[in-house]
Amino acid sequence: MMGGVAIDGGNSSSDKPRRGRRVRMTGAERRQQLLDIGRTLFAEKGFEGTSVEEIAAKAGVSKPVVYEHFGGKEGLYAVVVDREMRQLLDGVTGALTAGHPRELLEQAAFALLDYIESYTDGFRILVRDSPVAQSTGTFASLISDIATQVEDILGLEFKARGFDPKLAPLYAQALVGMVALTGQWWLDVRKPKKAEVAAHLVNLAWHGLDGLESKPQLVGRRKN
């Protein structure tokens, strides 16, 4: 007690705990941070299982910041999906530039597996169904785009071998679908190594094509 006034050193302003300061970022840096956090959460929990609150908390910001950059969870998800689709499409189509058809098949199969290995979260997002994906693009639509390019390659090969080039779209869908489904399986098992998986895919696809019958028939009798 001093001069009738109680002195409490514990209430000194210098002793009060300080709150952690929010890291200052530019608009572009904050947007990228939110995209990275959203990408991770969408891969782990899916679109429905992820909330704006959780995204904001992970970023250390308030919910309005997420809305300011993307308009909401749907907008953020759409941007994430679009970026992953571009990444995968660029990788696979870049492998279909030039070379012998077998080499092109090898390169395309390896490119898909390489994407899965390098961008696992992105691939999980692409293959997971979401209502939002219906308007932003789906894995099925991406595979269809790739099949269209494979169709052109097969069309030339069919002409050279005397097969009907009108059937190229059917075979293109079958080939790309085979590689895509195998990729989804390999996403979880990761065995054998991607080079070996690609080799086996090409082995089945190429030797199957190499031994094609010009007019295949079903062994059993079918009316339709």
Spans of features found by a protein language model:
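Hydrophobic alpha-helical connector segments
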Residues: V79, T93-T120, A172-L175, A198
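Amphipathic alpha-helical packing segments from all-alpha helical-bundle domains
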Residues: R86-L89, S135-K159, P169-A174, E196-A199, ...
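Generic hydrophobic, amphipathic alpha-helix propensity
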Residues: R30-G38, I55, V80-E84, L88-G91, ...
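N-terminal intrinsically disordered/low-complexity leader segments
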Residues: M1-E29, P165, E213-N224
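Short coil/turn segments at alpha/beta junctions that flank glycine-rich nucleotide-binding fingerprints
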Residues: E44-E48, Y119, R161
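Hydrophobic alpha-helical segments that form the core
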Residues: M2-G10, D164-W185, E196-G208
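Amphipathic alpha-helical segments used for helix-helix packing
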Residues: Y115-G137, E151-G155, L181-D188
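Helix-turn-helix
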Residues: Q33, I37, L41-G75, V79
